[in-house]
Amino acid sequence: MNGQNRNEISPGAEVYIVLKKDQRSGKRTHGVVKDILTNSPFHPHGIKVRLKNGQVGRVQEIIKKWL
């Protein structure tokens, strides 16, 4: 899953995000979602989330959904 739809992401989901500082390189950061920051149901560049470690970025790939 590509992380563009808000309804596919929930707190506790395991994801890869791209941090703002890594947007040019595309370097991805692995983590677990703590908060969903994007309010709209869809975002073409990925839903913005805060990971449990405090990092903020846009979801590029959902590894495991929290059920």
List each language-model region with its residue ranges:
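Basic/aromatic-rich interaction segments and small domains that mediate binding to polyanionic partners
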Residues: 2-67
